Amino acid sequence: MTARFRTVFVTSKPVIGMVHLGALPGTPLYDPSVDLIAAARADLHALQAAGFDAVMFGNENDRPYEFQVDAASSAMMAYVIGQLRAEITVPFGVNMLWDPMASVAVGAATGAGFIREIFTGTYASDMGVWSPDAGKAMRYRDRLGRSDMAMLFNVSAEFAHSLDQRSLPDRARSAVFSSIPDAVLVSGQITGEAAAMSDLEAVKAVLPDTPVMANTGVKHDTVADVLRVADGCIVGSSLKFDGDTWKPVDPDRAQDFMDRVRATRA
């Protein structure tokens, strides 16, 4: 476990709640009549009131996704976080799908404690063939003076299939050796779908000293089992009204989720 991870996440097996911003400027679904700040504020306060260990701001609504995020989208993400900064009482992170460099830039600019992205591997995806550069992203982080910002590596990308012939555990183990992530994330096939427990178990078995987190599809009735294996989780869709990714956070669902987490920890 890296010093950065321990510094950002003081709780054992942290649970990170997602603040999915509405579609941002420069994307097809952007609606200028939507108050992005008010919507993000409501989700943020619901998650903090429920007791989430951390929150992460993401641009899940910026469909169709791109490998290089529009500058206007990054600027708006940074602006929204800046407007809410004084109200954030827990560690927070940023993810600009599917752009590692934009994630680094926005995370650095807003004072985020961590970022999430795909940083390693080669994938065939809905967006095309995809080969991120972990070395470039990490060096960029350091040039921006944010070597303290933790980088969480998703090693099983949603909406994509790895072109690497190695097994997921081998790819995860190799990524840790070659690219020094602060944590490894294991995902399902798309947003809101769970990673197979067998995948979580296999990756954790080969990375006993590296945090391995469940990245997608953790639900109220599975979180206890997930946290018996994983070193934490990131959750979004399960917390929304009707469990719908595109709806706001339901304070009652968020509270119930963390009540179950606390029962597991006890």
Segment roles from a protein language model:
Residues 21-24, 102, 106-183:
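Conserved anion-binding
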